[in-house]
Amino acid sequence: MSHPSKLDRAAIVAAGMELLARDGLRGLSLRAIAAALEVAPNALYHHVKDRKDLERMLAAEVSVLIHAALRRKINSTTRSPEDAVRAMAAEYMTFAREHRLLYEALLVPRPAGGADAIAPEQLWLFALDLVTQVSGKVAAHEATVAIWAFLHGMASLQSVNAFDDEKPFSSFDFGLQAWMWAANAARLAEEDAARGRVKVAGKRAAVRHNR
């Protein structure tokens, strides 16, 4: 890597992402990044507090990458809400498989708020919007967390080669379909409740009119 003309957070993130893609979180250190940037380790502390701060910066950058990958996949064709969620789920798994070491950084602990929380929040809102179109608004947050947990679990199993003939990867389709049934059921229940409220409101209006 060439020596940066200006040492800033962007240069540190770029070097950190290269290191992360090659060695993963275990190989990540401020000293290694300083060596890649050809600067003294102390120079980094003007821009990065410590290793945890560095991990949060890189997790935010990984969020940007996976968000872009998901959005490209969704925008590639016109899809129904269910197809869009299926495409998102498949692309999430693809990213986790093809960029395993980057994916490891996606869920590092991070405090709420701050500049490094913006990208993960945007990724969350993107997924929430897709899920809401399937699950309805009432159960949207629960449904989004549920599919996130499912995908992360499957990605984690995939990363350790846990799937075989007895534990087939086709269980991904089984689990995703189960989520679809639950999400659709939540939306239908919400729609039924809304129709019930409209019907009750209509009856009350008729009673008032007849008085």
Which stretches of residues belong to each language-model region?
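Amphipathic alpha-helical segments used for helix-helix packing
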Residues: 93-114, 156-164
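Helix-turn-helix
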Residues: 11, 15, 19-53, 57
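Hydrophobic alpha-helical connector segments
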Residues: 71-101, 120-124, 147
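Amphipathic alpha-helical packing segments from all-alpha helical-bundle domains
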Residues: 83, 107, 111-137, 141-146, ...
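C-terminal peripheral helix-coil segments that are non-catalytic and often amphipathic
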Residues: 129-137, 160-211
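Alpha-helical DNA-contacting segments of helix-turn-helix folds
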Residues: 20, 55-62, 69, 106, ...
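Short hydrophobic clusters on alpha-helical segments that form packing/core surfaces
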Residues: 12-20, 28, 62, 66, ...
